[in-house]
């Protein structure tokens, strides 16, 4: 049997690092609940045929976060169908095309009663590329040793096209911190830093009594429109035409990997708007 998570000794307690792959984090973390998560995923994989196990293990362990998330959704859907005592075929063949949907559900006479396709709404590729370039900057600042009671607020005010040299940036930040604490003992001071074609804004908060493990205590993210119904509609439009006319019901499962859906009400609202227009 192919396993995504092998039985190894794990002692890591730290949270996920900026730029770290989800698989690496979930494979190493020893916090409460993570053993159970790994056990669930391995059990779901064991329900697949051997060839399908190898494919999804390779995709989730060697690919990026998109591949990990999409594989996780596929496993969850397959396990849910199995839990309903349904007979499921993975990647069933279709006449007249080499394309294969994710699943087919069979009745008692082994006739296909439904095809199921899983898709994930992801952030744009540009966002992923920017995050990968930013990760070394963030992690270098996060590892700065601050005095007791100090912590950074962190924001990217202009993203660059490449990762800049880090040593001059960290040296500049260290000097600013020391000067701010001794010359301007205020609870909050702010400064912008230029590193290559990147522009960062740091807030230095001081006056507390805790020794923080990490230098960055809060971050500001990009502000953008939240329009999950548009993403749902786009996913439905693309997948609805993928296999042409089918002789059975066709169900499209859309997973949100952009963090736009916040609960049952927002999901229902987004789905209603998407389907009404679609």
Predicted regions and their residues:
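Short acidic loop-to-beta-strand element that houses the catalytic metal-binding Asp/Glu
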Residues: 91-93, 97-108, 112-118
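Surface segments flanking catalytic/ligand-binding clefts of nucleic-acid enzymes
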Residues: 45-54, 81, 86-91, 103
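Interdomain/boundary linker segments immediately adjacent to catalytic/signaling cores
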Residues: 1-71, 75, 125-169
